Amino acid sequence: MPIGNPINTNDIKSNRMRQESNMSAVSNSESTIGQSTQQQQQQQQYLGQSVQPLMPVSYQYVVPEQWPYPQYYQQPQSQSQQQLQSQPQMYQVQESFQSSGSDSNASNPPSTSVGVPSNATATALPNGSAITTKKSNNSTNISNNVPYYYYFPQMQAQQSMAYSYPQAYYYYPANGDGTTNGATPSVTSNQVQNPNLEKTYSTFEQQQQHQQQQQLQAQTYPAQPPKIGNAFSKFSKSGPPSDSSSGSMSPNSNRTSRNSNSISSLAQQPPMSNYPQPSTYQYPGFHKTSSIPNSHSPIPPRSLTTPTQGPTSQNGPLSYNLPQVGLLPPQQQQQVSPLYDGNSITPPVKPSTDQETYLTANRHGVSDQQYDSMAKTMNSFQTTTIRHPMPLIATTNATGSNTSGTSASIIRPRVTTTMWEDEKTLCYQVEANGISVVRRADNDMVNGTKLLNVTKMTRGRRDGILKAEKIRHVVKIGSMHLKGVWIPFERALAIAQREKIADYLYPLFIRDIQSVLKQNNPSNDSSSSSSSTGIKSISPRTYYQPINNYQNPNGPSNISAAQLTYSSMNLNNKIIPNNSIPAVSTIAAGEKPLKKCTMPNSNQLEGHTITNLQTLSATMPMKQQLMGNIASPLSYPRNATMNSASTLGITPADSKPLTPSPTTTNTNQSSESNVGSIHTGITLPRVESESASHSKWSKEADSGNTVPDNQTLKEPRSSQLPISALTSTDTDKIKTSTSDEATQPNEPSEAEPVKESESSKSQVDGAGDVSNEEIAADDTKKQEK
């Protein structure tokens, strides 16, 4: 049967009645939260007592002060959308209506599309009240249809008053006899008479009543009779009195009834899943934040599950009222969402995860989602625009964090230290509410403009506050976070405390902010600015220290000799980082360690050695040629095995390792005689072959690659050049000599380090005879071959 038609018996418009019938169909399945017959009887009694006097008045316009509830917001949705959506629900949920025309028929087992038998009087549901989907008795149907109606008496008593206040959006159906929805006894008689007609819209009425009652409970009108208050406590404790006239349309009742009627709610959900779109009702004050139907407003789910909470349980509906905030009593505004205390500025649109889980698990009904979305909009509207002048400060990023608004949950902001080049000072900047507030490190002044921008105050008020400051420094040039009016630290702190943003800017207003930074980064004592500029472990003051003063123990240990002795020198246009390392202990791969010898610092070098170094950098290619095929050891660590070939990037098979000897004490002598040598423990091989200061590798080099001076004329000059010496085939001596020593692996045997160390000792002792003898032996070998 067309569900809406029988409702025409009422003076209400057919459209309204149709909607209401749809609502009632929905609410019947929902209200099937059956309670013990005693409770039902009690409910009926309460309803009869409190509501009957009001019954004849089906539409009373409630004074907005008394009825600030946003039911009309909610129910306009329910009507406009419920007309579309609740009708399919009607067919799904209340097949019994269609078949029998009345809920009262127990004969229709599939009362809900879910397939809950209509007779199933007691189906245990989480709320603890059995779902009495439809009882065979019409009289019982009344009570059964009532969803969690803890509040009927209240709602019904004032329903007549409240009904038409939202009338612009929806109309509250009167029972067939013209009595208000809240009058259960009359409803029962009407239903007995017209079970088909009145039952349908009675459920809708029940829904409306349910909403109104819940809202009434939430606000607990002074107008309500004390009896109503008692009914609250009783019914909330014992379980919602099931009132046939009360439809489960009120957001709380929907939630509760749907918790209990999870089955019926399942049937309802598919059509109504689109239902909760609050954006359809964008009232002037609403933010469109709740356009997402699933992001339920943080209406405290607990209040829904435990209706005993009375006003707090109503907070869900109250949140809908938010647009009318002017009408709400102050206590109600506080109650509106117990999750957010008065200080909470966070947009309530972001519910805690447990709320979401609650909503999804317990509230399957779509109308709940509808209310949730509405509540969401309302809540967001209230908390952001009404509650606090600074809507989003509670979260470090208004968009990001899911904090509940308490300062304890605020994530500590990150402090960034940057260098203000123009002012030659460091700056600490903390971002709050999307704005970076900067404090100078030298004089602790704070950018007052950005500080006040965090509060989201108007520009005029901000400028007025800043103009009142006696000490201020205006910066008009630079990056955005540096522009503005800079005020002293104390004044900035006072303003921040007055505007209640000091906590959000932690630790900007801690006097000794360096200590906080060091605590947060114990491993890195340097400020983050140094790391941001690429300089590690250097305190900010080192910006202004000469390079030579740097002491970087963490520098690379395999630094070339020239870098070590003359660290700030620019070798071949390549800037060498300044690292003065007293002792280099790196050992080339595959080489056994020699004795560690301390590097002479630059102050130990004589002036002429530095000049040698300088000339070395300019004339390096020539020096390499002049020195035979041994390139200067600039690019090698002290203990690295120096291959004449490897210096040039060529690796002939017959190259022999050249192991540097530790530094000798006669640095002056070697530096004078060795033009290209750098006193880093590596004495460059000299062209003269007879020197007693030759180290062992220089001797081997001379024997293998360079010819003593007395033989240079006999050798082709190319043999002394690095590349030709390595590649030329015309000098048999060189090839054979290197082939002899090619048998020595790159990793010298253990005997070799001893030999080399002994040779270095012989150097130090001035035992030149040994070296001369070895050279002579080598020469004889060459000549023989």
UniProtKB/Swiss-Prot annotation:
- Region annotated Disordered sits at 1-45, 78-121, 202-355, 519-538, 642-785
A molecular function annotated in GO for this UniProt entry is: sequence-specific DNA binding
Domain named HTH APSES-type: which ranges? Answer: 414-520
Pfam families in UniProt: KilA-N
Q: Does the keyword Lyase apply?
A: no
- An annotated GO cellular component: cytosol
Q: Where is the composition biased (Polar residues)?
A: 1-12, 20-37, 95-121, 266-282, 304-318
Q: Which Gene3D superfamilies match?
A: Transcription regulator HTH, APSES-type DNA-binding domain (3.10.260.10)
Query: Low complexity bias: where?
Result: 78-94, 206-219, 232-265, 322-339, 523-538, 655-674
Question: Where is composition skewed (Basic and acidic residues) in this entry?
Answer: 687-702
Cystine pairs annotated here are none
Q: What does this protein do?
A: Plays a general regulatory role in the cyclic AMP-dependent protein kinase-stimulated (PKA) signal transduction pathway by regulating the expression of genes important in growth and development. May inhibit the switch from unicellular to filamentous growth.
Cross-referenced PANTHER family, in alphabetical order? Answer: PROTEIN SOK2-RELATED
Q: What name does the UniProt record give this protein?
A: Protein SOK2
Q: Tell me the lineage of the source organism.
A: Eukaryota, Fungi, Dikarya, Ascomycota, Saccharomycotina
